[in-house]
From Swiss-Prot:
L-aspartate binds at E174, R220, H467, R508. ATP binds at R220, D221, E222, Q229, E501, G553, L554, D555, R556. Disulfide bonds: none annotated. This is Aspartate--tRNA(Asp/Asn) ligase. It comes from Albidiferax ferrireducens (strain ATCC BAA-621 / DSM 15236 / T118). Residues 198-201 are annotated as: Aspartate.
Length: 611
């Protein structure tokens, strides 16, 4: 016989007059004039239990209850007295009059109150089991479950087959460092945990499983950020005989359906933007369209100005000069203060910028002025070093109005894109940005397409793949892979939502000769290609179908949906930013015997510093 009849949080006024049996944890116990009230909690929420002293044995047990005791309650559902209804709870119109009370397991005093919102992350992760009892975490993980179920339902309805691929595979160069697993049987050889199932899912297409998916763990040994984990969950999908447009349409429908069924959110239109346009307008390949600020291209304007910071960047190979107009940023009342501007100047240095030039637009009507006083309606130390034609062009291109502030970025294009792109987001999300309608609180999805096939690595002096080396070039671009790799555009695509890359993919190369051209462009020799990817090259020769796919980061999707500050808030047992599990103390030393069996001898290990 089941130990309970209902979940605590699902007991409502539809059960009035019925006897229920509940199991859960004591959230709070209150003694009011001889009557004890106990809030009992489970994954679905709370219900109030009333313990009356008329039942002496039961009441004695209730007197001994403390927070986090695991208990069983049997009692009668009745309406709460007038004036005590709690509209914020599903169970807020009723209470349970306790008839029987059993302590299933007492609890020691918890190291913190579960309703404490100011806990450090170290405390939360060290005591993760208790942290997971908090409604915030329970709601996050329940949403994660529902999203995964909706994804499975959609894919199943569209003919996709869930197929597992190996966790122990071959180490291949895919960008990040592999997590290696030593082989006991094959001395000196290692498996690698998968960074993605990329090659196996392509092999499944060759094998004839034309619609594949799995929700799987992937592993990357890389430096961690707020949106990264060494192990993460991927919704991995591949399909044959669909065009790039077909693939994007199908999985746009999937994400739209998931948001509607789980959050009742209509995502609306997904604008499609080329990579080059995204970088030109926002300095990012995952722009946050909620922020109503855009770059203004000024490189061509600044080639002959006396201000060397601008002219140097404008004339250097790979340099860029942009403006970022902040409407209302120079107003005397409600504009950005000198302290805020100085803080932004320090902020962009994080991204390699040397400083942050600006012009305050006070009164355009005063015009360019004269030699004695140039541009009297503008306020900036750089105006004197920029000729009138350039200043007029800056004002025209940016659409500047009285009270506006124009920030400038001038350096190598990557530094400008990173620094001014980050500044755009920071200002947009600031209180100033929200008060001045520079930020729109909404869901803004989009597709970014037409990525370059390759980018040049200055340090290694060779081209690297922007997505991965199995991405197909656009039709007509194959020959450029050899003659002009920098011109070659791929059939890659990313789905972006509110500045986060939710998922990305591409049409794949399905011909061995084209795949070899990519390896040639990447300076991967035929011998290395055969050693690393011979199994794929061989498979492509057996009538491989046209195919493509994508992968969504489940952790990121849930982070976006919940508004969590960290991806660690949507994973049951995450790692810290130092790739440690504070709950289990992993990684940890292992027994010398285990190392000998694996043919491993350690250098003297350094102790792990505390997180």
């Amino acid at each position: 016989m089941a130990m309970r009849s209902h979940y605590c949080g699902l007991v409502t006024d539809t059960l009035l007059g019925q006897t229920v049996t509940l199991c859960g944890w004591v959230n709070r116990r209150r003694d009011h004039g001889g009557v004890i009230f106990v809030d009992i909690r489970d994954r679905e929420g709370y219900v109030q239990v009333v313990c009356d002293p008329d039942r002496a044995d039961m009441f004695k047990v209730a007197e001994g209850l403390r927070n986090e005791f695991c208990i069983q309650v049997k009692g009668l559902v009745r309406a709460r007295p007038e004036g005590t209804v709690n509209e914020g709870l599903k169970s807020g119109k009723i209470e349970v009059l306790c008839h029987e009370l059993t302590v299933l397991n007492p609890s020691v005093t918890p190291p913190f109150q579960l309703d404490d919102d100011n806990l450090s992350e170290t405390t939360r992760l060290t005591h993760r089991v208790l942290d997971l009892r908090r409604p915030y975490m329970q709601n996050n993980l329940m949403l994660r479950y529902r999203v995964a179920m909706e994804v499975r339902k959609f894919l199943d309805a569209n003919g996709f087959v869930d197929i597992e691929t190996p966790m122990l595979g071959k180490s291949t160069p895919e960008g990040a460092r592999d997590y290696l697993v030593p082989s006991r049987v094959h001395e000196g050889h290692f498996f690698a945990l998968p960074q993605s199932p990329q090659l196996f899912k392509q092999l499944l297409m060759v094998a004839g499983f034309d619609r594949y998916y799995q929700i799987t763990k992937c592993f990357r040994d890389e430096d961690l950020r707020a949106d990264r984990q060494p192990e993460f969950t991927q919704i991995d999908i591949e399909t044959s005989f669909l065009s790039e447009q077909d693939i994007r349409d199908l999985f746009q429908e999937m994400i739209t359906t998931v948001f509607k069924t789980t959050l009742n959110v209509d995502l609306g239109e997904f604008p499609v933007m080329a990579y080059s346009e995204a970088m030109h307008r926002y300095g990012s390949d995952k722009p946050d369209l909620r922020v109503k600020l855009e770059f203004t291209e000024l490189t061509d304007v600044m080639t002959d100005v006396d201000f060397k910071v601008f002219s140097g960047a404008a004339t250097m190979k790979g340099g860029r000069v942009v403006g970022l107009r902040i409407p209302g940023g120079a107003r005397e009342v409600g504009g950005l203060s000198r302290g805020e501007i100085d803080a932004y100047a320090e902020f962009v240095k994080i991204y390699g910028a040397k400083g942050l030039a600006y012009i305050k637009v006070n009164e355009l009507a005063k015009g360019p002025g004269d030699k004695a006083l140039r541009w009297p309606g503008l306020q900036s130390p750089i105006v004197k070093n920029i000729h009138d034609k350039a200043i007029a062009e800056v004002l025209a291109r940016t659409g500047a109005q009285d009270g506006d502030l124009i920030f400038f970025g001038a350096d190598k294009a990557k530094i400008v894109n990173d620094a001014i792109g980050a500044l755009r987001i920071k200002i947009g999300h600031s209180e100033f940005g929200k008060k001045n309608a520079l930020f729109e609180k909404s869901w803004r999805p989009m597709w970014v397409v037409d990525f370059p096939m390759f980018e040049f690595d200055e340090e290694a002096q060779r081209y690297t793949a922007v997505h991965h080396p199995f991405t197909a070039p656009k039709e007509g671009h194959e020959d450029w892979m050899v003659t002009a790799p920098e011109k070659c555009i791929s059939q890659g695509y990313d789905m972006v939502l509110n500045g986060w890359e939710m998922g990305g993919g591409s049409v794949r190369i399905h011909r061995a000769d084209v795949q070899q051209k990519v390896f040639d462009a990447l300076k991967i020799s035929p011998e290395e290609a055969q050693d690393k990817f011979g199994f794929l090259l061989d498979a492509l020769q057996y009538g491989a179908p046209p195919h493509g796919g994508l992968a969504f980061g489940l952790d990121r999707i849930i982070t976006l949906m919940t508004g969590a500050e960290s991806i660690r808030d949507v994973i049951a047992f995450p790692k810290t930013q130092r790739a440690q599990c504070l709950l289990t103390q992993a990684p940890s030393p292992v027994d010398e015997k285990q190392l000998r069996e694996l043919h491993i001898r350690l250098r003297t290990p350094e102790p792990i510093k505390a997180a």
